[in-house]
Amino acid sequence: MDSGSRVNVNIQGTRVLKNKLGKIPDIDISTDGKYLLSASTNDVLLVWDLHTSNKVAFFEAPSVWIMTCAFSPSTKSIAAGGLNNFCVVYDTSVPDADPVELVGHAGFVSCCKYVDDGHLLTGSGDKTCMFWDIEQAKAISVLKGHEMDIVSLDFLPSNPNLFVTGGCDKLAKLWDLRAAYCCATFPGNTSDINSISFFPSNADFVTGAEDGIARCFDIRASAEIFQYSSPSSSPINSVLFSKSGKLLFIAKDKTCEVWDSISSKTITSLTGHENRISSLALTSDGTMLATGSWDECVRLWSSSG
């Protein structure tokens, strides 16, 4: 999305995908950049073709308000979780087949990400993460350490055994799946963490919080390295780095700020949504950003820079 060392980045809205099936709490883009997955609060999952903007698959999830969704690395399956405390996994090639149900959490499932095609990680309002064998529909391990709801998680791009979580206890934590334990805790946030995301090429991660502050931490130094503060103190709903890591996308209210992490300046604000932006997703080549919103739309943005 960014253009080398230039500060002026030309990001343009290209298309709008209209859901009309309820608020969109989460979106994901397939690894190959061909498809977008959107979840709606009316318990519907839609798969969109990003080339044609057409809906290509429709799944009804047995939930009471979906909160999270994810593509598998191969796009052969999708996962979703919500207020019914479990996660469902669908085979995308057989839309009418019964989903695999991953049951075990004692609270809502707020976030999920695939480790690989056969394994999934979920975070929950029961303060735990669970690492699942999808084929067996069984939890391999339960990771405990947060004092309140877990809201967001992300994997270290260079090592999927390591991941970070953020939650309502204002803490970010680093975990190792191999030993199923917490490696480090990162204090510093002064309100609930709504979103957490790794820098694409190293061991830094960013948190977006309810108080409108985004903080970037280095897991090697166990220290905060920079901070963004919203002028309006509006809650940050989602954060995501550009492919190079130079830009930080920050979703708050109805806008997405594009912030230069080197100069510590806002380059532009992406507008057009009529309700809060809840989720951000980026194609693996970094050329397309998607914003999902409670206005029942997904907006697509691209840059020629």
UniProtKB/Swiss-Prot annotation:
WD repeats lie at residues 19-49, 61-91, 104-133, 145-176, 188-218, 231-260, 272-302. It holds the Pfam family WD40_Gbeta. It comes from Schizosaccharomyces pombe (strain 972 / ATCC 24843) (Fission yeast). CDD domains: WD40 (cd00200). One of its GO terms (molecular function) is signaling receptor complex adaptor activity. Belongs to the WD repeat G protein beta family. GO terms for biological process: adenylate cyclase-activating glucose-activated G protein-coupled receptor signaling pathway; G protein-coupled receptor signaling pathway; negative regulation of induction of conjugation with cellular fusion; negative regulation of transcription by RNA polymerase II; sporulation resulting in formation of a cellular spore. This is Guanine nucleotide-binding protein subunit beta. InterPro entries: G-protein_beta_WD-40_rep, Gprotein_B, Guanine_nucleotide-bd_bsu, WD40/YVTN_repeat-like_dom_sf, WD40_repeat_CS, WD40_repeat_dom_sf, WD40_rpt. It is a peripheral membrane protein. GO terms for cellular component: cytoplasm; cytosol; heterotrimeric G-protein complex; nucleus. Keywords: Cell membrane, Cytoplasm, Membrane, Nucleus, Repeat, Sporulation, Transducer, WD repeat.
